[in-house]
A protein has these predicted regions:
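Extracellular and secretory-pathway beta-repeat/beta-biased strand scaffolds
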Residues: 2-470, 476, 481-484, 523
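Surface-exposed repetitive/solenoidal architectures
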Residues: 331-804
């Protein structure tokens, strides 16, 4: 009879002890393999038998030192019989800003217990292994690479952006000393094991520990520079200290160990042109994080840590202090040890994204089996390739402003996946939001959810409820299915290429009254016979969406036309359109759309932080963003497409006709009005064709092109200002501007109607438009303000555009 299985916690402890035992066995065997080299260092020792085999330079011995001189920024390759440095010895490479590759061809490993320095870049390659002893000090001005893998001389001498190293020798690279590069990277590379138990510093570069049979080095200032091919099953261990702009530990199909100890063992600090980034990668193996990792950018903001492996393990001191921590693994269960690591990191202000991939035949499920609670603004995303589940008796809670996202089908492939909550989600003390996303053919089990009764949506977010459940839209077919339940909540699970078969794609929805969150994704190559969502009702919300395509052939019965919607009476937030919208003139059975916009035809709701670069052409009125703003609000939005009205009505760069409110917005597209523009028919305006509403803190810069016109020429802001009703008087405030040079307009408003005034808009030159002080006190260009003036810009842009 077999003995009873120990409890789960005991089994985890046994696995940790076994894992630690294997780790120390790896370290011990690696050190043992190089121990004989240490024994030979009683007397001083210098590299022996060096000869240039590519490039040119001089090698000279001076007592306890050796100096290699290589002129200018050249490259060179030296082959050595041995390359070791005794405790009281030094080797100096005076190689300017060039690079020198040192290859050891003898049969002994390299042991560096003295000083090794270079003005430029330095490569040391020894297939027998390399150890930097406790007294060893290495410093370079450029990149330092120490490797048991070899590289082709010709490839090295050519330079360029990439270099491949390969080898099959079971040797290790070990650092017990101090290795630094003041201006470049530090790379430690081996097939069997790379161990850092000393100090590595690269304030302006990347510190990389990589184990594998083949490694690609690639120059990059913003992403990973080293890529390890599967094979070798090597081990990377850090039990020392690493501080660099970026840090990477990779073992491909081996194991990565980030060990614990005093303080932060791995710290990425970033530079002006490199974000602070840490990578822990073992796609076919295991990453074990036992200590604290820190990543920050040069400006003090939080950096990024990416952890990806077939298996993930965390010790009792594991934590990440950064802006973002991304974890990726085939499937995952958040048990006690994981929950503690995530909780410590979330409380430190680190937002976390855990994603399962379903790789290696795994289920791709993501389960929460241990409770998680934290305070503060950090957010947690749990995204599963298959299902997400919260176990019975488990609680996820936040007190602060943190968000929680539970997403099934993270790959967006319509697996029919579900979000299952058998536990409790407590956001009663949080001002953040909770989102659950499942496939249209999947399901949702709500469990116990506690929301905050005093919650209110952040300004301009387009949010409606604190806790929202969405069905994922991953395909064109899913998009069409929205029409079956137009009052539901939907979210784009991925970018959708809507390239049509022969014929046009009919509108997805005739009338939409639910929530549609694009999640920042794009629907591209739309070819619409009408708008995408038809009419957006009073309770309808569309947010965080990009759409690209063309809309034409609107029904003869259509009164309004736009790429996103014919009419909007709800809320549109952070939606951006590109492409073209075309509506033609009188038809056999109807007059066709009266007003056409790049985003919507008629706006009676709210549009905020949105834009259109679509070209708009209409027989009647046309606007770059909105055809007619009918008692609606357009705020913090812009349009830059060309706008054309081919007959009878006017056109505006942002809005055709305004009867509502336009504020903190602008237009830069060319406005064409043809052929009728006279004292009877409306002409073009840089911002609006005509207005009987309110315009404030807005401007226009686009050329106004009208072949004929009445005296006074085009209006830089509007063709006319009118008082059509007491509830809609025409008001143009003094913080409205137009560029007198680019628009070709000498007046802001051409004419007035029904007792309105010309308003207080002001003309500025292009140079004045590029100077923040020209816009007066109402334009806020400060941190957190509405406006920004990028270097070299000829006009302001909206602050939110900087984040795109």
């Amino acid at each position: 009879m077999s003995p009873p299985e120990p409890p789960r916690r005991t089994r985890r402890a046994l696995r940790r002890r076994q894992s630690n035992a294997r780790l120390w066995l790896v370290i011990g065997s690696a050190l043992t393999g190089l121990s004989f080299a240490h024994a030979t260092l009683a007397a001083g020792k210098l590299p022996q038998g060096g000869t240039y085999v590519a490039g040119a330079g001089a090698i000279a011995s001076h007592g306890d030192g050796l100096v290699v001189t290589q002129p200018g920024s050249t490259r060179g390759v030296i082959e050595w019989n041995s390359f070791s440095i005794g405790r009281n010895n030094s080797v100096t490479f005076d190689n300017g800003s060039g690079a020198t590759l040192n290859r050891v061809t003898g049969g002994s490993p390299s042991a560096i217990f003295g000083r090794l320095s270079a003005t430029g870049s330095l490569y040391v390659i020894n297939p027998q292994g390399i150890v930097v002893g406790p007294s060893g000090v290495i410093s370079t001005g450029g990149r330092f690479v120490v490797s048991t893998l070899d590289v082709c001389n010709d490839a090295f001498m050519q330079g360029g952006g990439s270099l491949t190293l390969s080898g099959d020798r079971d040797a290790s690279v070990i650092n017990l000393g101090k290795v630094s590069s003041s201006g470049g990277d530090v790379f430690l590379i081996a097939r069997r094991a790379v161990i850092n138990a000393g100090t590595i510093t690269a304030p302006n570069g990347t510190a990389e520990l990589a184990a594998g049979e083949q490694v690609l080095l690639q120059d990059s200032g913003s992403s990973r520079q080293v890529f390890v091919q599967m094979g070798g099953q090597g081990t990377v261990v850090n039990r020392g200290h690493i501080k660099a702009a970026q840090v990477s530990l990779q073992a491909a199909d081996g194991n990565v160990y980030a060990l614990a100890g005093g303080g932060t063992r791995i710290r990425a600090t970033g530079t002006a042109d490199r974000d602070g980034h840490v990578w822990l990668v073992a796609d076919g193996g295991r990453v074990s994080q036992l200590g604290k990792i820190s990543a920050s950018n040069a400006d003090g903001s939080g950096g990024t840590v990416d952890t990806q492996a077939a298996q993930l393990a965390f010790g009792k001191h594991a934590a990440v202090h950064a802006g973002q921590w991304n974890l990726s693994t085939p499937d995952f269960t958040i048990d006690d040890s994981v929950a503690h690591a995530l909780q410590r990191s979330l409380n430190a202000g680190t937002s976390i994204d855990v994603t399962t991939t379903g790789a290696n035949g795994a289920t791709g499920d993501l389960g929460v089996a241990s409770s998680l609670s934290w305070s503060g603004p950090a957010s947690l995303t749990l995204a599963a390739y298959h299902d997400v589940s919260v176990a019975t008796g488990t609680t996820i809670a936040n007190s602060g402003a943190g968000n929680l996202t539970l997403r099934a089908d993270a790959a967006g492939i319509d697996n029919g996946d579900s979000v299952i909550n058998n536990g409790t989600i407590d956001w009663s003390r949080s001002t953040g939001i909770v989102r659950a996303l499942h496939d249209i053919t999947g399901g949702y089990l709500p469990g116990n959810i506690h929301s905050n009764s005093t919650w209110s949506a952040p300004p301009d977010s387009g949010l409606v409820t604190q806790v929202t459940v969405y069905a994922l839209v991953n395909t064109v077919s899913d998009l069409g299915a929205v029409g079956l339940n137009p009052s539901g909540n939907y979210a784009l699970g991925r970018d959708i290429d809507a390239t049509p078969p022969p014929g046009e794609f009919s509108p997805a929805v005739a009338s939409f009254s639910g929530q549609f969150d694009g999640m920042g994704h794009t629907i591209s190559h739309l070819w619409l016979s009408g708008s995408l969502l038809g009419d957006i009702g009073y309770s309808g919300v569309v947010r965080n969406l990009n759409i690209e395509g063309s809309a034409a052939n609107f029904p003869e019965s259509a009164t309004w036309a736009g790429l996103l919607a014919d009419t909007n009476y709800g809320t549109i937030a952070s939606v951006h359109s590109s492409g073209s919208v075309t509506s033609i003139g009188p038809l056999s059975t109807g007059i066709g759309p009266l007003s056409t916009g790049g985003l919507v035809g008629l706006n009676g709701g709210t549009i905020t932080r949105s834009s259109s670069t679509a070209d708009v052409s209409s027989y009647y009125a046309a606007g770059g963003l909105v055809g007619t703003n009918s008692f609606g609000v357009v705020r913090e939005s812009f349009a830059s497409g060309d706008v054309t009205s081919t007959h009878y009505q006017g056109a505006g760069g942002l809005v055709g006709y305004n009867f509502g409110v336009i504020t903190e917005s602008y237009a830069t597209g060319t406005v064409h009005v043809q052929p009728q523009c006279d004292t009877v028919n409306a002409c073009g305006g840089g911002l609006v064709g005509g207005t009987s509403g309110t315009i404030s803190q807005s401007f226009a810069t686009g050329k106004i092109d009208q072949p004929s016109g009445p005296a006074g020429g085009p209006g830089g802001i509007a063709d006319y200002n009118a008082n059509y009703s007491a509830s809609s008087p025409g008001t143009i405030t003094g913080d409205v501007y137009w560029d007198t040079q680019t628009t070709g307009a000498t007046v802001g408003v051409r004419t007035t109607l029904l007792g309105a005034t010309l308003g207080d808009a002001k003309g500025l030159t292009t140079m004045q438009m590029s100077t923040p002080s020209s816009f007066g006190p109402t334009y806020d260009f400060g941190p957190g303000g509405v406006w920004a003036m990028p270097v070299g810009a000829t006009h302001p842009i909206l602050q939110w555009q900087l984040a795109q």
